[in-house]
Amino acid sequence: MTTLSISRSQTLTAMAVRLGAFAVFVAILIYFAVQARGFLSPFNLINVVEQTTILGLLGFAMTVVFIGTGTDVQKGGIDLSIAANAGLSAAIYAVLLKNGHGDPVAALAAVGSGVVVGLLNGFAVVRLRIMPLLATLAVMNIAAGLELTVTENTVVGASSPLLALLTSGRFLGISSLAWCLILVSSLLVAVVHYSRTGLRLYAVGGQIEAARAAGINTGRYILGSYVFSGFVAGVTSILIVSRLSASTPGTSLLLLPILASALLGTV
């Protein structure tokens, strides 16, 4: 079998998986539309979008890592630390608010924490050349341990004007959380598909040697994908606190749903 045949086979397999996932989604949608009155009402659809905001944003971040590094377990990339990173950032945000710091300081600290974790992942993968699976697994354990240290393994309540806006704010009848998912996902799709950066990211993840031969700084794009993942985890941590009015242990349990949404979905 030629290289071209293998490439076509892999492409067809990937398309089949994605179309299959979409078909299942449509089937579930039709089932609930028939069985549950009001399921397709605007109020319920907006509520569904709001409920999936956190998972959706983290799933998009993981997808960017897959695009920029590939999905091969050994040669490709993955960010197993993304859920723990969001949990750590949420803990930092809630603790700072509880200690009297305002939204600007707490939010910057949360996002900064996420970016630092992303940088650590990227450094381990690009510079130290550690297998992404092992590198991000180690960082995941570090982030989870730091979260327990920061919160002392307790629920940390939080309230602020920003959290109130995210919780109860609405525009055109759509909640702030739903707008976060709509705007970020639209922007991400536009950047990944129609910008020079997005096309190069696809090139690096698809054929890294060819991308390197074309003069693309592959290490920079791989590092950037992990930093972006960390940035999104930091931003999403604020949304997590807004939904729960607290930072709670257990955010790392989102990892499997995030992986499923990234592997079966598409950007």
Sequence positions of predicted segments:
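Transmembrane alpha-helical segments in multi-pass inner-membrane proteins
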Residues: 69-72, 230-233, 243, 247-267
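Hydrophobic alpha-helical transmembrane segments
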Residues: 15-23, 48, 81-85, 93, ...
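Single transmembrane alpha-helix segments in multi-pass membrane proteins
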Residues: 31-36, 43-99, 128, 266-267
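Helix-loop-helix "hairpin" substructures at the membrane interface of multi-pass membrane proteins
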Residues: 102, 116-119, 173-247, 259
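Hydrophobic alpha-helical transmembrane segments of polytopic membrane proteins
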Residues: 60-66, 113-118, 184-186, 257-267
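Transmembrane helix-bundle core of multi-pass membrane transporters
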Residues: 128, 132-197, 221-224, 243-251
